[in-house]
Amino acid sequence: MEVFRKEFICQKFEAHNHTEETLFAMTGGILIPFAKPGKFTEDELHIFYIPKGAGISCRPGVWHWAPYTLEESVMCMVIFKKNTSREDIYFTELAEPVGFEL
């Protein structure tokens, strides 16, 4: 999927209860917000930088959202079990948007 540069603000998150999700930075680095399974607060939000050529796997139940990038656009590979985006996807959101700095 193509990831475009956008403001570093997040509020919505998704999780998959039965499926891991792997994200691989193909043409440039990506930043991904993560939070522990269950209820979480903005203080428990973590942003990880994944450099070009590297990837990260998200265990079932871990909250995450679409990648961000420092570049104009990059390509990112997203890998999960077939039909996960229809059959094993749950959403939550924080009360207010949260910004992050590098």
Please name every model-derived segment.
Residues V74-M75:
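Short, surface-exposed ligand- or partner-binding patches at beta-edge/loop junctions that are enriched
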